[in-house]
A protein has these predicted regions:
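Bacterial N-terminal signal peptides that target proteins for export
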Residues: 1-7
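Bacterial N-terminal signal peptides
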Residues: 8-17
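Sequence signature of WD/YWTD-type beta-propeller architectures
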Residues: 18-477
């Protein structure tokens, strides 16, 4: 098991009647505890925040954490929730001499208590990147009150705002990208009054109005080349329509889209007539880890929104010349929607360059509203499809990212309720096998349910991002 440590969780419910002092549940059942979030059988990094959980409807639960056959600590929780002591949790995960780790829990479900069957948590020796960044926004259609880009420390529960729309008079703040997981080099868009694209490099910030740079088109979906200097953008004319008597009430779609490459050293926007014309719609650029190949999605134009269900995006790639900023003559089609069916969006290549993860829906370019949208993975060595079924659900899976080690992925999913996108983490083995996804840990397990905002565009970052807020505000005066 690659020197992983196996944590087995034995959970039992204990509902105390008035005046009862019993600590041992009276009845044992051969069933896993109905904990929320579901952490049974997941593989977690050795530096992850505590996996606090609850049993809904319980008044008290008690969890015993056992490692190597001996009890390490016990955590008691009122109102049905367990808050694991962080120091004890870290010590448990760091115990490299333990071949097997078992966790036992007693939860409150009946007056006399119930002891549940144990469940396992597998602890990987592979750490996860310290931070993730994401946007939080109400899942509305046209309007919003507040949105922002945030960072979360995955080793604890700290969350900080990087930038929100108070800096640009409540305009849209979106589409962040980091250069090669660096907390010191990033960009984001801020629309509205005095808007522009903000580039951050080593503590210095610069706002650029891409729409005033020939060819006078605004950048939308970005990805910074891992080697620096260049940023690939798609420029999208996006709209949405609402439909009655249809299983899907709204469709977000492009009416045109092209590719552009911005040279951060010269301030020039580079275009290629093959990918900047009315002949095709190109979107979602993504670089290979060495920065020498650009992947992107491409579709034949249709009359929108009437022909929305016939729009299907292929997955293409082209070589990139870093010296000139030009794309090569050869263009490969990796996924042909005419023969394979479906529509591709959000391509992302693993750090070792072997795998490419993408989102596949029946049609279109905005899978967030498509319940059938799933994550798919391609082996770039031979073009075969890798089994990613462990990651998917009956609701929409959408944007995603690889960790810098390639051993973890984060992705957005609506599996909880079909309305809000929340973030899930999953392990990746060296041979491309995905572990059971688990919900982003929170100090209070209910936070995942009562936070009425959607997460999108999760990105791993190697360390803390520091943006001087005063300087940010000054950019938009």
């Amino acid at each position: 098991m690659d020197a992983r440590h196996i944590m087995t969780v034995a959970a039992a419910a204990l509902l105390l009647s008035c005046g009862s002092g019993a600590d041992e549940a009276a009845r044992a059942v051969d069933a896993l505890p109905p904990i929320y979030p579901d952490y049974a059988g997941v593989t977690v990094p050795c530096n992850i925040a505590p996996l606090n959980f609850k049993i809904r409807g319980a008044e008290r639960i008690r969890a015993e954490f056992v490692a190597g056959g001996e009890a390490r600590f016990v955590a008691d929780g009122r109102k049905g929730a367990i808050e694991i002591p962080p120091k004890k949790w870290r010590a448990l995960l760091a115990d490299a001499d333990v071949a097997e780790v078992r966790v036992s829990a007693w939860s409150a479900a009946e007056p006399e208590g119930v002891r549940y069957a144990p469940f396992r948590i597998i602890v990987s020796p592979e750490p996860i990147d310290e931070r993730i960044a994401y946007r939080l926004i109400e899942p509305g259609y046209e309007g919003w009150l507040q949105m922002g880009i945030y960072q979360r420390d995955l080793t604890n529960f700290d969350e900080d705002v990087l930038v929100d729309n108070s800096v640009n008079s409540t305009g849209c703040v979106n589409c962040h990208s980091f250069r090669d997981y660096s907390p010191d080099e990033m960009l984001f868009h801020a629309r509205g009054k005095s808007g522009g694209t903000v580039f951050v490099r080593d503590g210095r910030m610069k706002k650029v109005d891409l729409a005033s740079t020939p060819p006078l088109r605004q950048g939308v979906y970005p990805m910074w080349n891992p080697r620096g200097r260049y940023v690939a953008f798609s420029t999208n004319d996006t709209a949405q329509s609402f439909f009655g008597g249809h299983g899907q009430p709204v469709e977000v779609y492009d009416q045109s889209s092209d590719l552009m490459i911005y040279d951060t050293e010269t301030g020039r926007m580079l275009t290629d007539e093959r990918f900047f014309s009315d002949a095709r719609w190109e979107t979602f650029p993504a670089w290979s880890p060495d920065g020498a190949t650009l992947y992107f999605c491409s579709a034949e134009p249709r009359s929108m929104p009437l022909d929305r269900e016939s729009v299907r995006y292929d997955l293409l790639r082209a070589e990139f010349d870093f010296a000139t900023g030009a794309l090569g003559e050869r263009v490969d089609t990796l996924y042909d929607s005419r023969t394979a069916g479906g529509s591709v969006s959000f391509p992302r290549v693993s750090p070792d360059g072997r795998y490419l993860m993408y989102t596949r829906a029946d049609y279109g370019t905005f899978p967030v509203w498509h319940a059938e949208a799933d994550l798919a993975v391609m082996d770039l060595c031979d073009g075969s499809e890798v089994d990613a079924s462990a990651l998917n659900s009956d609701e929409a899976e959408s944007c995603h990212a690889w960790s810098s080690s390639g051993r973890w992925v984060v992705f957005a999913s609506r599996r909880e309720d079909g309305r809000y996108t929340r973030l899930y983490l999953a392990s990746v083995s060296p041979d491309g096998e995905f572990g059971k996804p688990f919900l982003l840990p929170q100090r209070n397990p209910d936070q995942n349910a009562w936070r009425l905002k959607s997460y999108n565009v999760p990105e791993f970052v190697r360390g803390e991002v520091r943006l001087p807020r005063g300087e940010l505000k000054a950019l938009f005066k």
